[in-house]
Regions:
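Surface-exposed, charge/polar-rich loops and edge strands
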Residues: 177, 185-187, 198-208, 215-311
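Flexible, glycine/proline-enriched loop segments at strand-loop-helix junctions
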Residues: 64-66, 125-133, 154, 182-189, ...
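A short aromatic-anchored loop/beta-hairpin motif
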Residues: 27, 35-40, 47-150
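N-terminal secretory signal peptides and thylakoid transit peptides that target proteins
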Residues: 9-37
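Beta-strand elements within well-structured catalytic alpha/beta cores of enzymes
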Residues: 56-61, 90-95, 181, 202-215, ...
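Residue-level detector of intrinsically disordered terminal segments
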Residues: 1-5, 15
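Long, well-ordered alpha-helical scaffolding segments within enzyme catalytic domains
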Residues: 74-84, 190-205
Length: 311
């Protein structure tokens, strides 16, 4: 899959993001996927053991890549959260930074590479490697679980910063297998929620389903230099985050899928790339599972760092 590095001020642009792997992924996978998909689906779907309990679902507001290096309230909460969660057999990550068009991909690598999909940051950030193994067998389980659309296995991606910058704090030993699922950016919000519903079956196989994005994300409207804090610097950001929190409290999934109707949505979700991972997590959570707030607050004034656990 062809990749390009992006400056963080551009990494929420759909035009830029969809070029990440579009040529290689769509030409070699989506356009010629039939034979590949049939071959993959014919493989054994053996999982890596049966867990003693159903795994939770989590959503993480990942914010800036610099959080990988930071020691702040957000990263300290991630570190503590990793110790509270039951140990998974594997992690399936749906990151805002792997977008595709017309197809959904899943990483099949034995050893997924660490992707530094950003620019303009200190060398120390580019030096980070998160050497978690992949899990092709459970990736094949994901192919079989998703009924909404064909899912194509691919070797052409890895772990982008939406995944590894948070896992570095959650699971610093990088000893839990990780694989990613792409977001088909041509599809509406209801589609992403429905795919999340399909992915719920993996929870019973020991998989921790993780969405990584931000429920409020508009890089052109951030207030850089604003200290991290509990409240947003702009009313539209606070209003939308509060609306999401209220809908979660009542598990009003319908309102969260129809997010455009929530207060401040036009600015808070100027592009939906960072909101869609939240819908995968919401869908993978049972409708009766309470949403537990793990962390809430804002970085750069308007980036919601809200983190949620279901189950």
């Amino acid at each position: 899959m062809t990749m390009m590095k992006m400056h963080p001020s551009e990494d929420s642009s759909p035009a830029m993001q969809t070029e990440l792997g579009r040529r290689g992924f769509l030409m070699s996978s989506a356009l010629g996927a039939t034979a590949t998909l049939a071959a993959l689906c014919s493989l054994s779907n053996a999982a890596a053991g049966t867990p003693g309990r159903r795994l939770p679902v989590i959503f993480i507001g990942h914010g800036s890549p610099m959080n990988a290096l930071a020691d702040n309230a957000f990263t300290r909460r991630l570190a503590a959260w990793g110790k509270e969660l039951p140990r998974p057999s594997a992690i399936l990550s749906v990151s805002a930074h792997w977008l595709s068009r017309g197809a959904t991909g899943v990483g099949m690598q034995e050893r997924p590479k660490t992707i530094h999909d950003f620019g303009g940051f200190p060398q120390a950030l580019f030096d980070i490697d998160y050497p978690a193994p992949g899990h092709p067998a459970l990736a094949r389980e994901a192919i079989g679980a998703v009924k909404q659309t064909p899912v194509v296995g691919t070797q052409q991606w890895g772990l982008d910063h939406g995944t590894w910058t948070v896992l570095k704090h959650l699971y610093p030993k990088a000893d839990i297998p990780v694989f990613q699922l792409s977001i088909d950016y041509d599809k509406p919000a209801a589609f992403h929620y429905a795919v999340g519903r399909d992915l719920a079956a993996l929870r019973d196989k020991g998989v921790l389903v993780m969405g990584s994005g931000n429920v409020v994300h508009n890089l052109r409207a951030t207030d850089r230099g604003t200290p991290d804090g509990p409240a947003a610097s702009r009313p539209w950001a606070q209003g939308f985050d509060d609306a999401v929190k209220a809908a979660l409290a009542g598990r009003d999934d319908r309102a969260l899928v129809a997010y455009e109707k929530l207060e401040g949505a036009a600015t808070a979700v100027a592009t939906p790339d960072h909101y869609f991972p939240f819908l995968y997590a919401l869908g993978a959570a049972g409708s009766n599972e309470r949403a537990k707030t793990i962390y809430e607050g804002f970085q750069s004034g308007t980036l919601s760092m809200r983190c949620i656990q279901f189950g």
